[in-house]
């Protein structure tokens, strides 16, 4: 399996709440059915807010997390798929090209957002060790 991971940054003119609400409700609604129709394994979002960065990291690491170690992206979005061809079908679909892709201008920072792709391994799922 493979994963396409987006280190997302909100547009400068959006609040954290506006950004997280938009990607969770509007943008994901454009994309979910298309992903499912093309055998995509999973589509997940991790929402990183100033509260989670400050409060939760501080609680988990008891104030021992150096500030320079904290990456301040607003969200991490991950699409997991079995073959690259599965994901290419999504990107080549007319709905992706006319609705999903153009929607990025409504929320994504055009220069800060970053992308990575690699193979995907699952070691624990549903509270059970996966071998």
From Swiss-Prot:
Domain of life, source organism: Eukaryota
EC number: 1.-.-.-
Entry keywords, A to Z: Monooxygenase, Oxidoreductase
Pathway linked to the protein: Secondary metabolite biosynthesis
Residue stretches making up the EthD domain: 13-109
Molecular-function GO terms, alphabetical: monooxygenase activity
The family this protein is said to belong to: Belongs to the tpcK family.
Protein function: Dehydratase; part of the gene cluster that mediates the biosynthesis of phenalenones such as herqueinone, compounds that have been reported to treat tumors, bacterial infections and/or mycoses, and rheumatic diseases. The non-reducing polyketide synthase phnA synthesizes the heptaketide backbone and cyclizes it into the angular, hemiketal-containing naphtho-gamma-pyrone prephenalenone. The product template (PT) domain of phnA catalyzes only the C4-C9 aldol condensation, which is unprecedented among known PT domains.
Protein name per UniProt: Dehydratase phnD
């Amino acid at each position: 399996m493979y994963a396409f991971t987006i280190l997302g940054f909100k547009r400068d003119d959006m609040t954290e709440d506006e950004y997280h609400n938009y990607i969770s409700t509007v943008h994901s609604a454009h994309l979910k059915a298309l992903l499912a129709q093309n055998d995509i394994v999973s589509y997940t979002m991790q929402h990183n807010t100033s509260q989670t960065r400050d409060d939760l990291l501080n609680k988990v690491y008891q104030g021992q997390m150096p500030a320079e170690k904290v990456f301040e992206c607003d969200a991490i979005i991950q699409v997991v798929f079995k073959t690259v061809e599965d994901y290419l079908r999504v990107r080549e679909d007319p709905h992706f090209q006319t609705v999903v892709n153009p929607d990025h201008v409504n929320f994504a920072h055009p220069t800060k957002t970053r992308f990575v792709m690699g193979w995907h391994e699952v070691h624990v799922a549903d509270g059970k060790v996966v071998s």
